[in-house]
Amino acid sequence: MSYEDRDTYGMYKNYDEKGPGPRLMGADTLIGDDVYNQNDEDLGDIKDIMLDVNNGRIAYAVLSFGGFLGMADKLFAVPWSALTLDTVNKRFLLKVDKARLESAPGFDKDSWPNMADPTWQNTIHTYYGTTSYEDTKSSKDYVTPAHRNDESFIPQAPVGTDHVKREWD
């Protein structure tokens, strides 16, 4: 099932057509989306989306793979940056062979890892060949503590960046 099939509010019918799909999407419409690889192999579907609430970013999509009728599925936290939205086929693409996904670090539904643990994050990003968004230079480096209590101050992201970090976080 695709995000358009779950669009009960009609959010996506008139998106701006400037990108590969809607610019903003409801997280609940992504749950259940299929994930395929470049060989058109079914890798499973998205079971959950993990948000980094401190940074306002999507950190991981939790992918379910390998079970039968939802039983004995293995779960995998895939870095959001490793996924690409395929708007033609209404699914996500992950550039990983099925055999490699089968041997990826995973977990079961009753034993989730601590996804905030930097060692765990490094393992996952290394496995999928991605860089954590926390490791990329951003406007987060340009806000000083002097602005901490100034409610009128609205930090601006420098050109080429997408978010603002407060130094006191």
In which residue ranges do the predicted regions lie?
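Peripheral interaction segments used for macromolecular assembly
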Residues: 1-169
